[in-house]
Structures are given as C-alpha cells and as structure tokens.
Amino acid sequence: MDQAGIIRDLLIWLEGHLDQPLSLDNVAAKAGYSKWHLQRMFKDVTGHAIGAYIRARRLSKSAVALRLTARPILDIALQYRFDSQQTFTRAFKKQFAQTPALYRRSPEWSAFGIRPPLRLGEFTMPEHKFVTLEDTPLIGVTQSYSCSLEQISDFRHEMRYQFWHDFLGNAPTIPPVLYGLNETRPSQDKDDEQEVFYTTALAQDQADGYVLTGHPVMLQGGEYVMFTYEGLGTGVQEFILTVYGTCMPMLNLTRRKGQDIERYYPAEDAKAGDRPINLRCELLIPIRR
C-alpha cells in the first residue's frame, strides 16, 4: 500500500480511538512502523505533526461534549486522555481562546477552534449560501428521544426514518416539500446524554389529507446558512456530520440559538414506503454573522 493509503487508514482508525490511549508507540505499532518513520510519513502526507493533530481532534471532540451534554468537565477531560482538569483547561483555552466552562455556558456556539478530521485528497464543500427566512407557520408532530453522544449519529438516522414513517403512515403520496425541525440539548436526567426533539412538519396549505394529529408549529425566521445535499436519504446523516464537523469550522461560523431546519424535496418518482428514496435536502442552520 502506498504512503497515502497507509495514512488514510490510520486517520480512520485514529478517529475511532480518540478516547483510547494513543501514545506514539501505540500508534506506530498499529501502523507497523517505527515511531520516527511514522511521524515523518504522517508529516509528509498531511503536512501536520501527528501528536498535535491527535490533541487538536481530542479537544474538538471534547468541545462537542461540552455543548451537547452536562457531563462534568473533569469527566470529559479524563475521557479524552488529559491527566487533570487543569491540563485540559490550559490546552482547551489555547485552542478555543476561552475556558471549557465559558465555552459550555455561551448562548451561541462558535466553530472557531474546531479542528476538522483530516481528509486526504480534494474535499468539495457542499453547496451553501446565506439566506434570511420569514416566520413560517407549519403543521407538525414533535417527538423526542435521549441518547449518549456516542450513539447520536446512528440514533438520528434511525429515528428520522421512524418519525417520518409514522408521520406519513396514512399519506396517499409523499408531499413535495417536507420539514424536519431538530433541536438538541443536554438531558436533565442523565449528564452523559442529550435530549433530541424532532418535529416532522408540512406547510399549512399542504397538511390536509396528510397530517391527522398535527399541531401548529412556527418555523422561526432569521439568518441561516443553507447547505444542500442530493442523493439517497441514507446519506443525510453523514452529510449533516460533515457540515458540522468540517464546513462550519472552515467557514468560521457562529451558530445562534434556534432549531436546525431540514427541508426535503423527495424525487418525483418517490413512493410512500420506499426505502431509501432519492431526495434533495436543504439543511438550514441558524447563524449570527
């Protein structure tokens, strides 16, 4: 395997082991090289020092845990292999220009300091633009679930499918435009979990015949950044992870309070009950510029 292939596999492995012991000796043993040779090869292929990259990714993961859970700061520090809360706080402040406690309490979430996972080769930013929305009345159904940070990606994919299946269970056809409103906040019952509130909704003038038990929902107006995905519905969650993990930091955007909006345009030939379906998804994230 060529050097780029070796480092690509190593990057994938590292991403799944950031909360495990990752001394350079361990990482080199995993890759099958001497520590010195691996450090040089990693720097040649990526342009980054492997130790600094691992630390920056761990701090980025800890930043997400600070925002989305109520887990104690010391627990987060230890999970991502810092030997004390003081060591963690110093490193965190150096990368994010504020302490972990202030980062957690801020009403807004700046992407400044987040170190996206390295990708070898060209990365194509999803199509995006800045838009201003008006308040829009919808009819929808809100459901919620709790899960750990480590489970959230798989849970969101399955819950999104289940909620839409329930919502459209009696629909004769799939409506031309669907809205998913998503809000995540730390669980009040378990400090290592978050509560996710997800609203499946339609515009008021499209709801007749589709929604039997919906309630009025207001899509909040304001400034948003809109990213666009086209493909199978099974790719939506990976697209959202890319937007938050890579695109928001690359654009250095600040997320303000509010719900994420998923606006779906199913393919014209999509049928109720099909899985997966082709669609276009516009992900709108509330921002402050």
Curated annotation (Swiss-Prot):
GO biological process: regulation of DNA-templated transcription
GO MF annotations in UniProt: bacterial-type RNA polymerase holo enzyme binding; DNA-binding transcription factor activity; sequence-specific DNA binding
DNA-binding region: 25-46, 73-96
Domain HTH araC/xylS-type, first and last residues per copy: 8-106
Gene Ontology CC terms: cytosol
The keyword rRNA processing is annotated on this UniProt entry: no
One matching Pfam family: HTH_18
Keyword Transcription appears in the UniProt entry: yes
InterPro entries: AraC_E-bd (IPR010499), GyrI-like (IPR029442), Homeodomain-like_sf (IPR009057), HTH_AraC (IPR018060), HTH_AraC-typ_CS (IPR018062), MarA-like (IPR050959), Reg_factor_effector_dom_sf (IPR011256), Tscrpt_reg_AraC-type_HTH (IPR020449)
Keywords per UniProt: DNA-binding, Transcription, Transcription regulation
SUPFAM superfamilies according to UniProt: Homeodomain-like, Probable bacterial effector-binding domain
Cited NCBIfam families: PRK15121.1, RobA_TF
Role: Transcriptional regulator. Binds to the right arm of the replication origin oriC of the chromosome. Rob binding may influence the formation of the nucleoprotein structure, required for oriC function in the initiation of replication.
This protein's name: Right origin-binding protein
Organism: Escherichia coli (strain K12)
